[in-house]
Design a protein with these regions (language model features):
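N-terminal activation segment of mature serine protease catalytic domains
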Residues: 21-60, 67-69, 73, 81-83, ...
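PDZ domains, with a preference for the canonical peptide-binding region formed by the helix
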Residues: 65, 71, 258, 270-298, ...
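PDZ/PDZ-like groove recognition
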Residues: 165, 216-270, 274-281, 305-358, ...
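Gly/Ser-enriched beta-turn/beta-hairpin loop segments
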Residues: 35, 89-91, 135-138, 148-160, ...
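Short glycine/Trp-rich loop-beta-loop segment that forms part of the substrate-binding cleft
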Residues: 78, 112-136, 294
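Conserved catalytic-core segment of clan PA serine endopeptidases
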Residues: 70-102, 110-115
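C-terminal cap/linker of serine protease catalytic domains
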Residues: 23-33, 104, 129-132, 182-239, ...
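Active-site loop architecture of trypsin-fold serine endopeptidases
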Residues: 47, 67-70, 103-106, 126-143, ...
Length: 407
């Protein structure tokens, strides 16, 4: 029985019957907590969960940081050594293996189906908030609902939102459904006023995303796995209250997007049968694929729908060929000092003396040193091979729109 039924019971059939429902609900909840506790893992001041009887466990990448080996303790009190199997720094996920004696198994919670979650479903978060488990040797359980699915929150691009209370120390712990299955790994909270404590919004990496990455994590030999992206295409998003869509604005020749058959003007309808309603959803879906994945894009072209299959590859950093002038004080935006001959910047039409006023459709409205610093960092860290990068430059008294194809 569910908590919702007990609440409805109080309204419809009287206090006595509602009390019976509530008692059943409490028993169900207690049984789930009893089942989940032994599979919980205390690790590095944070949380984790065993998902297989052979001792494979999950936590957040930010919990393990750059360490390779750990002393961990299960919720049943037993302690083990654990070593990192694989890391996904972008997706904030890590897999570790407990060092078990030959033939020994440990309690575990299986992965569930996060795609079956509905807004309003009950959810339970298990964790070690504020390291309280150090005091009483037991994890804590908080109960809430699924507040949203397919949400984008920073690097969590397809996450689950819950109002089950999460606090520092809950990171890496499981979000479980009423069947006692792991539907997510908790990892972020929404904070206010600089206070790192629960505000009613917690974010979990979905079991769907975990299932996509688990085989790669197990094969990583302690290393890091890479995310993929669709290269050679520029999307344009119209996210408004009444109309939302994602269209292809430009496709670069000779790229994987061009080989897949994308055309300017295509509207993205779905990616691998997952509906794309807006730009956030499109970016979220594309953000969870591993390197080398193939994805089916359903696009609307004219009056018909066409399915395109594209290969997604890991980003490769590149040099744009742009050198910036040093800041000289005053209210200066980034100024191009030199353009490398034969570079992507020269092909795009950039010239010495150009003032960068917009990057990827956004005006550089910052104080002078901040604008230059942020733009310089973006040049070095966010532009990859086959990216189409819109730039607006001021040349004399005229603003010029340029498109840089990174090579």
């Amino acid at each position: 029985m569910t908590f919702l039924r007990s609440r409805l019971g109080a309204a419809m059939i009287g206090v006595g019957a509602a009390a019976a429902f509530a008692a059943d609900d409490s028993a169900d909840l207690a049984a789930i907590c009893v089942k989940a506790r032994p599979a919980f893992v205390f690790i590095a001041g944070g949380s984790g969960v065993v998902i297989r009887p052979d001792g494979l466990m999950l936590t957040n990448d930010h919990v393990i940081e750059n360490r390779r080996r750990f002393d961990v303790r299960l919720g049943d009190g037993r302690s083990f050594k654990a070593k990192v199997v694989g890391r996904d720094a972008v997706g904030d996920l890590a897999a570790l293996q407990l060092d078990l004696p030959a033939g020994e198994t440990v309690p575990h919670l299986p992965l569930g189906d996060s795609e079956a979650l509905r807004v309003g479903d009950e959810a339970i978060a298990v964790g070690n908030p504020f390291a309280l488990g150090v005091l009483d040797q037991a994890p804590t359980f908080t109960v809430g609902i699924i507040s949203a699915v397919h949400h984008t929150q920073g690097s969590y691009t397809e996450c689950i939102v819950t109002d089950a209370e999460l606090n520092p120390g809950n990171s890496g712990g499981p979000l479980i459904n009423m069947a006692g299955e792991v539907v997510g790994i908790n990892g972020q909270i929404s904070t206010r006023y600089g206070l790192r404590s629960n505000t009613g919004l917690g974010f979990a990496i979905s079991a769907r995303q975990i299932a996509m990455w688990l085989p790669l994590l197990e094969q990583a030999a302690g290393g890091e796995v890479k995310h993929a992206r669709l290269t050679g295409v520029e999307f344009e998003s119209r996210d408004r209250e009444t109309v939302a869509s994602v269209t292809v604005k430009d496709v670069a020749e000779g790229t994987l997007a061009a080989e897949a058959g994308f055309r300017a003007g295509d509207t993205i309808v779905a990616i691998d049968d997952a509906p794309v309603a807006n730009g956030h959803r499109c970016a979220g879906l594309l953000g969870i694929y591993p390197e080398g994945s193939r994805a089916a894009f359903r696009v609307r072209r004219g009056g018909e729908e066409v399915t395109l299959e594209a290969v997604l590859t890991a980003p490769q950093r590149c040099r744009t060929g742009i050198d910036l002038e040093r800041p000289r004080g005053g209210d200066l935006l980034p100024v191009v000092e030199a353009v490398e001959p034969g570079s992507s910047a020269e092909v795009a039409g950039l010239k010495p003396g150009d003032v960068i006023v917009a990057f990827r459709g956004r005006r550089l409205e910052f104080p002078a040193r901040d604008a230059r610093k942020l733009f310089d960092r973006a040049l070095r860290t966010t532009i990859n091979v086959d990216d189409i990068v819109p730039l607006t430059v001021r040349r004399g008294t005229t603003e010029v729109e340029l498109r840089l194809l990174a090579k």
